C-alpha cells in the first residue's frame, strides 16, 4: 500500500481526520523533500564535475542513483498539486511516468548500497589483495549495474499496469497488488539482509588480518546499513502489515458513502494510530532520496568542503584552466614579459641565467642542463 493513495478519499477514524493529516503531510514533506533533494542532487553533480571521486567505482554507482533520484524528485510536485486541488495534473502518461520512477527510486537507492558493499566484499574474498585493480573492479561493477538496471527497469515497467487515473486522481499500486509485497521483499528486506551478511563477513575477515585495510571504510558501510534499517524498515514493515487500505478499511471499519464523499468511521483508536504511523514512516522512508546519495558520496571521497570552495569561487571570479601557481609561468602563459625567457610568436628559447657574480649558472647544471642542451631546447 502506498500512503499517497490515502488522500484520494475522505478518511475519518473516530475523531481523527486522517485526510487533513495526509494533505498536510504531502504538501509540506513532499515540498521540503523536493527542494532539499534537488539541491543535494545538484550539489553532488557539480562535485563530480569539479573533482572526480577518489573511488571511481562508487562514483559510477552514485551517478546512476543521482539520475533516478533527480527524475523522481521532479515528479513529486505533481503529488503536491493533487493533494491541494484534488485532481491530477499531466494526464495518464504523467501518472504512469511518476509511478514508474517512484518505484525505480526505491530499488535503485537500496540496491546501489548492495553493489557498493558487494564490491568491497568481493575484494576481501580475493586471496591476493595486490591483484585487485581499479579496472577489474570497474568492469565487475559495470556488469552488476547492468543486471540491476535491467531488474529495476522491468519492475518499473511492471508498475505501469498498477498505476492509473480514477476520478481525475492518480492512484499508485496498493497492498492488494503483488508489486506491493515485491517492493517490501526485493525493495528492502532481501537487499538489507544481503548487506548485513556481507558486512559481518568483512568484519570477521579483517579481524584475522595483521593490518587494518582502511580502504574498506567498514564504519561507513555499517552506518549505511543502519540508515537503511531506520529509514526504510518501519515503512515497509507497516505497509506489508496493513496491506491494501481498502481491504484494511473493509476489515476494521464500517463503510458509509453518499453522493458527495466516501467516509470511513470506527471507534477504535488503534486504527487511527496505524494510519498516522503509516504517514510518518513514509515521510522517513523518502529521505532515501538524499541520505543514500550522501553516504555514497562519502564512500566515493567527493570532499564536499573542497567542492564548496570551488563553487563559491566560481560565482565570484574567473577560474583559470591552467595551474598558475608559479608567477613566472603565469606571466609566460598570459603573454607578459618575462626577463628569464626570450618570448617569440613561434618559440620560446631559454637563456642561461646570469649569477650576480658573473659566474656560470650552476643551478641549471645541477638540474642536468648544459650549454649545448640549452641551445637546442625550445618550448613550442
UniProtKB/Swiss-Prot annotation:
Region (Disordered), start-end ranges: 328-380
Alphabetical list of PROSITE patterns matching this protein: G_PROTEIN_RECEP_F1_2
Subcellular location: Host membrane
A molecular function GO annotation: G protein-coupled receptor activity
Gene3D superfamilies (UniProt xref): Rhodopsin 7-helix transmembrane proteins (1.20.1070.10)
Main location class: host cell
Membrane spanning residue stretches: 26-46, 60-80, 97-117, 145-165, 184-204, 220-240, 275-295
Keyword Endoplasmic reticulum among UniProt keywords: no
Disulfide-linked positions: 95-170
Family: Belongs to the G-protein coupled receptor 1 family.
Name listed for the protein in its UniProt record: G-protein coupled receptor
Organism whose genome encodes this protein: Elephantid herpesvirus 1 (isolate Asian elephant/Berlin/Kiba/1998) (EIHV-1)
Amino acid at each position: 500500500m502506498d500512503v499517497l493513495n490515502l488522500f484520494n478519499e475522505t478518511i475519518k477514524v473516530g475523531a481523527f481526520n486522517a485526510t487533513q493529516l495526509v494533505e498536510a503531510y504531502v504538501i509540506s514533506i513532499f515540498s521540503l523533500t523536493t527542494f532539499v533533494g534537488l539541491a543535494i542532487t545538484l550539489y553532488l553533480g557539480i562535485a563530480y564535475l569539479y573533482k572526480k571521486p577518489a573511488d571511481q567505482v562508487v562514483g559510477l554507482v552514485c551517478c546512476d542513483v543521482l539520475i533516478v533520484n533527480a527524475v523522481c524528485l521532479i515528479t513529486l510536485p505533481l503529488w503536491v498539486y493533487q493533494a491541494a486541488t484534488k485532481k491530477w495534473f499531466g494526464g495518464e502518461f504523467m501518472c504512469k511516468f511518476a509511478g514508474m520512477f517512484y518505484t525505480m527510486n526505491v530499488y535503485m537507492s537500496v540496491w546501489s548500497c548492495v553493489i557498493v558493499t558487494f564490491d568491497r566484499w568481493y575484494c576481501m574474498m580475493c586471496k591476493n589483495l595486490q591483484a585487485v585493480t581499479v579496472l577489474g573492479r570497474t568492469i565487475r561493477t559495470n556488469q552488476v549495474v547492468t543486471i540491476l538496471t535491467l531488474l529495476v527497469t522491468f519492475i518499473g515497467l511492471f508498475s505501469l499496469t498498477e498505476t492509473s487515473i480514477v476520478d481525475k486522481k492518480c492512484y499508485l499500486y496498493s497492498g492488494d497488488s503483488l508489486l506491493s509485497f515485491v517492493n517490501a521483499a526485493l525493495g528492502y528486506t532481501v537487499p538489507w539482509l544481503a548487506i548485513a551478511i556481507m558486512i559481518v563477513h568483512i568484519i570477521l575477515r579483517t579481524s584475522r588480518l595483521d593490518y587494518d585495510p582502511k580502504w574498506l571504510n567498514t564504519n561507513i558501510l555499517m552506518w549505511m546499513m543502519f540508515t537503511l534499517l531506520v529509514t526504510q524498515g518501519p515503512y515497509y514493515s507497516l505497509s506489508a502489515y496493513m496491506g491494501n487500505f481498502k481491504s484494511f478499511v473493509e476489515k476494521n471499519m464500517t463503510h458509509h458513502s453518499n453522493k458527495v464523499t466516501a467516509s470511513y468511521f470506527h471507534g477504535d483508536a488503534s486504527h487511527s494510530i496505524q494510519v498516522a504511523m503509516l504517514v510518518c514512516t513514509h515521510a522517513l522512508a523518502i529521505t532515501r532520496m538524499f541520505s543514500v546519495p550522501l553516504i555514497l558520496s562519502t564512500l566515493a571521497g567527493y570532499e564536499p568542503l573542497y567542492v564548496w570552495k570551488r563553487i563559491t569561487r566560481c560565482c565570484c571570479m574567473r577560474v583559470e584552466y591552467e595551474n598558475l601557481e608559479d608567477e613566472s609561468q603565469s606571466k609566460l602563459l598570459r603573454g607578459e614579459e618575462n626577463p628569464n625567457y626570450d618570448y617569440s610568436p613561434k618559440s620560446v628559447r631559454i637563456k642561461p641565467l646570469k649569477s650576480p657574480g658573473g659566474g656560470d649558472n650552476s643551478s641549471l647544471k645541477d638540474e642536468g642542463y648544459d650549454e649545448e642542451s640549452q641551445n637546442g631546447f625550445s618550448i613550442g
